Amino acid sequence: IKAFAAETGVTCRCFNKIGLFFKGGVNNRNHSKSAVIDGVKGYVGGVNVGDEYFGEDLRCGIWKDGGMSYEGRAVNALTEGFFTAYDFGRRKKERYERYLNRAKPAADGGELRTFVSAPTRGVSRLAEVYKTLVYNAKKSVVISTPYLIPDDGVSSALAAAAARGVEVSVVIPGIPDKKTVYAVTLSVAEKLKKRGVNVLKYKKGFIHAKNTAVDGRYAVCGSGNLDYRSMYLHFETGVFVKSAKLAKTVERDILKDAAPYEEKAAGVKGKLLKVFAPMM
């Protein structure tokens, strides 16, 4: 990182750096993937900066990811979330008011809200977004996630939706990037299947997108996985949009190249590893 900063002139900071006088939680990591350009355009999603994200590493087959760009004052939450992480653990805080978008909301703009989920806020915004959407779903819930290790609250919400007749579909990778975590994902998938949730696999390889579509009306895109770490340990960013056009596009994209999951879970291994799910 130091070499990159010196070569490019980009200011870089290590988040929650572990050192001799390290005080932060070792599991509290910045998992957000976001960018704000000139305070006008924001980007969120699952895309990191790495070879696999640009199709140059095919060990997991095709690596599918997702993201969303948008403009307007809603990007301010991304800017605020960035500086929350940028200043984490520091006494002196950066002043970021000059980076904020001052434009008036568009009169014909759809409903769009940026959310930041952080362990420092006491409540998991990510978990609340999932539970609120799923508990209020009337017809369908379609989710893509690379890791399926939700807490009991989200698991119960998914099962309850399926029980009341909502078509609940979750797409997981066909080829894993981490075999140990995948064993837990398969174990959870088996349990959710028994409770009426339709679990599918991305046929072409590894799906890293964290997208959701509900009732063909609401869409969510961001960095948060459907797992314990993203919900309670990591800093995450995402965007909620009320738009039938966008929601249907997201739903089609999630289900594209997805096939029914028929594989058996990793037996005792998966069940035992689930005990360590919060640390995975």
Q: Where do the protein language model's features map onto the residues?
A:
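Charged, low-complexity intrinsically disordered terminal segments
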Residues: 1-280
